[in-house]
C-alpha cells in the first residue's frame, strides 16, 4: 500500500522535472504532505517550506523517506526500529526503481541542515549531526528527539508564516 502511493507521488514529482531538477518550491511536497485524488492526480495540501534553488528529484525522495522513517521509527514497529534511516530510504527507492547516490545523500544532508537550522534554534553543526545520526544509526531515542525537533521547528515556521501573513 505504501509503495503504490509512493509510486503515484514519484510520478507527480517526475512530471514537474525539468532538465533533471524540480523547483525548490516542491521541497515540502513530501509524500505525507500530498494526497492521491480519485482521478489519480496528486494534490499538495501543505507547502509552507521552499528552497531558493532547484533540486534533484532524488533529493526530494530522500527527504520524503527520511521524514517518514523519523516519524514512524519510534512507533515500535520492529522492522523500522531495527533499520537505519538510510536503509529505509534505499529500500523504498529500490522498490520504485530509483538509484540513490552518495551525491544525492550529501545534497539532502546539506539542504536539511540549512533548512532546519534556519527555522530552528540549533546550530548547523548540531542539526547536521542529528540528521547524520538519523540516517546512519539504528533506532535510538535520538531519532524520536529529532522527529520532535523537526515537528517543533515546522510548528514554529507555521506560526511565523501565519503571523507574517496577518492570520494570527
Give, region by region, the residue ranges found by the protein language model.
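Conserved kinase catalytic-core helix
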Residues: 1-28, 32
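Alpha-helix boundary/N-cap detector
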Residues: 4, 80, 84-87, 141, ...
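Catalytic activation segment of kinase domains across protein kinase-like and atypical kinase folds
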Residues: 21-77
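Membrane-proximal basic amphipathic "stem/tether" segments
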Residues: 120-168
Amino acid at each position: 500500500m505504501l509503495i503504490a502511493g509512493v509510486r503515484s507521488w514519484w510520478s507527480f514529482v517526475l512530471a514537474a522535472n525539468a532538465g533533471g531538477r524540480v523547483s525548490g518550491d516542491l521541497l515540502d511536497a513530501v509524500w505525507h504532505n500530498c494526497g492521491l485524488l480519485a482521478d489519480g492526480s496528486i494534490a499538495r495540501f501543505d507547502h509552507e517550506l521552499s528552497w531558493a534553488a532547484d533540486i534533484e528529484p532524488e533529493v526530494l525522495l530522500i527527504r520524503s523517506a527520511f521524514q517518514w522513517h523519523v516519524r514512524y521509527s519510534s512507533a515500535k514497529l520492529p522492522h523500522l526500529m531495527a533499520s537505519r534511516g538510510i536503509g529505509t530510504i534505499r529500500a523504498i527507492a529500490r522498490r520504485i526503481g530509483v538509484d540513490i547516490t552518495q551525491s544525492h545523500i550529501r545534497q539532502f544532508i546539506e539542504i536539511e541542515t540549512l533548512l532546519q537550522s534556519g527555522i530552528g534554534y540549533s546550530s548547523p553543526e548540531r542539526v547536521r549531526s542529528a540528521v547524520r545520526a538519523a540516517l546512519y544509526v539504528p533506532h535510538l531515542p535520538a531519532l524520536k528527539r529529532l522527529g520532535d525537533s523537526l515537528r517543533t521547528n515546522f510548528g514554529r515556521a507555521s506560526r511565523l508564516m501565519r503571523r507574517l501573513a496577518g492570520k494570527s
